[in-house]
Structure formats: structure tokens, C-alpha cells
Amino acid sequence: MADSPVRPSMSHSYHCRIYVTLRPSVLDPAGTAVQSGLQQLGYDGVSQVRIGKYIELTLEAPDEATASQQLDTMCDQLLANTVIENYCFEITALEGAVTP
């Protein structure tokens, strides 16, 4: 079993937004159903609807590079099924959020 990440002695807080979507080659029945429903409501210009997941979390790390590496690992291990899903994320440092 892999070691748990060690909490750094001095860390910064980061607000993280993770977007998980099905790979383009994977059928999206939920997206198809939403697209059909919108078109039935008269929104004929709607096409290529894809349904995904949006995740927000706060992460403490010594620096943004470490936060990015940890977030990438979290996505690979749990937050996304990388066989059928792609993911991307945004990291924003929280102002003045340094913890001892």
C-alpha cells in the first residue's frame, strides 16, 4: 500500500476545480437524453451535449507545483476513470492562506 502524503510543516491553501468528462470516443447516453429534451423544448440549435462531473476542493501543499502533482495523482487514482474519462483542473492560491 502506498504511503499517505505527508502534511508539510509550512503550507499554502489552494482552491482546486476539477472537470471530468467522458472521452470523445465514449457514448454519452445522458448527454443524448439532455440534448433530445432541449430540442423538444424548442432549442434546436443545441448539439453535442456531453455530461460530466465538476469537483471543488481546498488543498494544502508547500507550493503550487506540489499541489498540481497531488491533484493529478488524486484524479488518476480516484476522481476520474481514466479508461473512459479525461480530466483537467484549475488551481488558485487562496490569499493569505499560509498554515504553519
Curated annotation (Swiss-Prot):
Its UniProt pathway annotation is: Purine metabolism; IMP biosynthesis via de novo pathway; 5-amino-1-(5-phospho-D-ribosyl)imidazole from N(2)-formyl-N(1)-(5-phospho-D-ribosyl)glycinamide: step 1/2
| Biological processes annotated in GO | 'de novo' IMP biosynthetic process
User: What is one term from the GO cellular component aspect held by the record?
Assistant: cytoplasm
| Reactions catalysed according to its record | N(2)-formyl-N(1)-(5-phospho-beta-D-ribosyl)glycinamide + L-glutamine + ATP + H2O = 2-formamido-N(1)-(5-O-phospho-beta-D-ribosyl)acetamidine + L-glutamate + ADP + phosphate + H(+)
Q: Which organism is it from?
A: Synechocystis sp. (strain ATCC 27184 / PCC 6803 / Kazusa)
Q: Could you tell me what this protein does?
A: Part of the phosphoribosylformylglycinamidine synthase complex involved in the purines biosynthetic pathway. Catalyzes the ATP-dependent conversion of formylglycinamide ribonucleotide (FGAR) and glutamine to yield formylglycinamidine ribonucleotide (FGAM) and glutamate. The FGAM synthase complex is composed of three subunits. PurQ produces an ammonia molecule by converting glutamine to glutamate. PurL transfers the ammonia molecule to FGAR to form FGAM in an ATP-dependent manner.
Highest rank taxon of the organism: Bacteria
Question: A GO molecular function for this record?
Answer: ATP binding
| Oligomeric and partner information | Homodimer. Part of the FGAM synthase complex composed of 1 PurL, 1 PurQ and 2 PurS subunits.
Q: Which NCBIfam families match?
A: phosphoribosylformylglycinamidine synthase subunit PurS, PRK05974.1
Kindly state which keywords UniProt assigns to this record, in alphabetical order: ATP-binding, Cytoplasm, Ligase, Nucleotide-binding, Purine biosynthesis
| Record protein name field | Phosphoribosylformylglycinamidine synthase subunit PurS
Record InterPro entries: PurS, PurS-like_sf
Q: Where in the cell is it found?
A: Cytoplasm
Q: Which family does it belong to?
A: Belongs to the PurS family.
Taxonomic lineage is: Bacteria, Bacillati, Cyanobacteriota, Cyanophyceae, Synechococcales
EC top class named in words = ligase
